[in-house]
Amino acid sequence: MERIDSHVSPRYAQIPTFMRLPHDPQPRGYDVVVIGAPYDGGTSYRPGARFGPQAIRSESGLIHGVGIDRGPGTFDLINCVDAGDINLTPFDMNIAIDTAQSHLSGLLKANAAFLMIGGDHSLTVAALRAVAEQHGPLAVVHLDAHSDTNPAFYGGRYHHGTPFRHGIDEKLIDPAAMVQIGIRGHNPKPDSLDYARGHGVRVVTADEFGELGVGGTADLIREKVGQRPVYVSVDIDVVDPAFAPGTGTPAPGGLLSREVLALLRCVGDLKPVGFDVMEVSPLYDHGGITSILATEIGAELLYQYARAHRTQL
């Protein structure tokens, strides 16, 4: 199967898949499978992330997949497919997370890696469980306005602020090989980062990122992660809401879109084994700019996967 050629069919035509990739609902033997996770039952504020995968795919036809001054296109280097969406109940979070974990585990038994597009961040715990099942305790690069290492709220076990706490508690993550970038804003309690820091996670706040810059932060990531299998999770709210307004919990003072894309180039120096781009809520977007950025982030991650796993780059 091949991508839809934009010189044959205009970019606004045909049924939208991520970056016009072929659709294969039962993928086998691919380098990276793109999978949608349309769910927002873990959202604590503004809903709408369940519509994120649909919006991202719709805008992703804009992106060709051949970067300037990069030589061969991403899809000339790795074999990718869009497998559609995971069928997730909107009524029960425990069932949704279990369903996502089972589906993602199945993908990794037949394919090398996945890029999950969401959907709220609660589903990342399902991804971590699936990837750790294959690779053991993971290094993690986590871009977000929030640490997402909160305890459970409102009597439930999960929400979109808990995935990395579960990941550390369940030993899916090696916290000594985890870096969080872009953390900022207001929190319910002054000890909101104590859990992450107390377990050895390197937290780079948005203010510290401003001091380190892209290069200094990338060096820190390379040093912390090394060549361990690494999962990369991007919450779109890491970006300043001036550039990514379409999200559920926006936080002013974030990174520029250009800074995020530049920082992700260091992923090609690592050993990536899975990705997600989460928390796009198109209900609050303007002109599709958040979904376009989410596509660019996904495209960058796919290219960096190719760079990490293909020696000719």
UniProtKB/Swiss-Prot annotation:
<dbReference type="GO" id="GO:0033389">
    <property type="term" value="P:putrescine biosynthetic process from arginine, via agmatine"/>
</dbReference>
<dbReference type="GO" id="GO:0033050">
    <property type="term" value="P:clavulanic acid biosynthetic process"/>
</dbReference>
<keyword id="KW-0378">Hydrolase</keyword>
<feature type="binding site">
    <location>
        <position position="121"/>
    </location>
    <ligand>
        <name>Mn(2+) 1</name>
    </ligand>
</feature>
<dbReference type="InterPro" id="IPR006035">
    <property type="entry name" value="Ureohydrolase"/>
</dbReference>
<dbReference type="Pfam" id="PF00491">
    <property type="entry name" value="Arginase"/>
</dbReference>
<protein>
    <recommendedName>
        <fullName>Proclavaminate amidinohydrolase</fullName>
        <ecNumber>3.5.3.22</ecNumber>
    </recommendedName>
</protein>
<dbReference type="GO" id="GO:0046872">
    <property type="term" value="F:metal ion binding"/>
</dbReference>
<dbReference type="InterPro" id="IPR005925">
    <property type="entry name" value="Agmatinase-rel"/>
</dbReference>
<feature type="binding site">
    <location>
        <position position="146"/>
    </location>
    <ligand>
        <name>Mn(2+) 2</name>
    </ligand>
</feature>
<keyword id="KW-0464">Manganese</keyword>
<feature type="binding site">
    <location>
        <position position="144"/>
    </location>
    <ligand>
        <name>Mn(2+) 2</name>
    </ligand>
</feature>
<comment type="similarity">
    <text>Belongs to the arginase family.</text>
</comment>
<feature type="binding site">
    <location>
        <position position="235"/>
    </location>
    <ligand>
        <name>Mn(2+) 2</name>
    </ligand>
</feature>
<dbReference type="InterPro" id="IPR023696">
    <property type="entry name" value="Ureohydrolase_dom_sf"/>
</dbReference>
<dbReference type="InterPro" id="IPR020855">
    <property type="entry name" value="Ureohydrolase_Mn_BS"/>
</dbReference>
<dbReference type="GO" id="GO:0008783">
    <property type="term" value="F:agmatinase activity"/>
</dbReference>
<feature type="binding site">
    <location>
        <position position="237"/>
    </location>
    <ligand>
        <name>Mn(2+) 2</name>
    </ligand>
</feature>
<feature type="binding site">
    <location>
        <position position="148"/>
    </location>
    <ligand>
        <name>Mn(2+) 1</name>
    </ligand>
</feature>
<feature type="binding site">
    <location>
        <position position="235"/>
    </location>
    <ligand>
        <name>Mn(2+) 1</name>
    </ligand>
</feature>
<comment type="pathway">
    <text>Antibiotic biosynthesis; clavulanate biosynthesis; clavulanate from D-glyceraldehyde 3-phosphate and L-arginine: step 4/8.</text>
</comment>
<feature type="binding site">
    <location>
        <position position="144"/>
    </location>
    <ligand>
        <name>Mn(2+) 1</name>
    </ligand>
</feature>
<dbReference type="GO" id="GO:0033972">
    <property type="term" value="F:proclavaminate amidinohydrolase activity"/>
</dbReference>
<comment type="subunit">
    <text>Homohexamer.</text>
</comment>
<keyword id="KW-0479">Metal-binding</keyword>
